[in-house]
Amino acid sequence: MPESRKPFLDPVLLLREVRRALLEDIGPGDLTTIRVVPHSLRGRGTLRAKERLVLAGLPAARIVFRLVDPRLRFVSLAREGAWLGKGDAVARISGPARSILTAERTALNFLQHLSGIATYTADCVARAGGRCAVRDTRKTTPGLRRLEKYAVRIGGGENHRTGLYDGILIKRNHWRMAGGVGAAVRAARRRSRRGAALPVQVEVSTL
């Protein structure tokens, strides 16, 4: 994916999410690695794709290793948004072995999860054949919505609403309580705050 077309990912938000993930996994310390791996041992390794995928999550993985230990060297061997085949190299890491072991699972979690979303999205876009846009929903992992929606864009999809606050989408429960689809649409248009030009959309089950 050309740099000019790469989706934007808020660096402040990304840093916050990575810190939260590391706190969740490491807590006060990696007890096993501290007790088992010699302090002076150095290591290196290469992350490789285990199957065909669209790569997403490199920025998160890089920050994981940097936060765990600034001495770790992370070198990207593939581009964010690139199609990779099984066995293709993603990145190379070198430095203190303890730190590599402590950081690897969190980094892999970001890469695997976001690449999975990007790959599935890219496959959906290909099947659509340009006849329609492929958009996401609010059915996201709590706390990871922004990152997951970023992965959708990496895969060539489009974002729909970020939350309940930035779009009007009338679903079955809404129009049933409003007295019908027409009544719900009219009410939504009438009650738009200060005439805000938000599109009013209705969820459908058939076309």
Task: Give each language-model segment a name.
Residues P2-S205:
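Acidic/glycine-rich phosphate/pyrophosphate-binding loops and surrounding catalytic core
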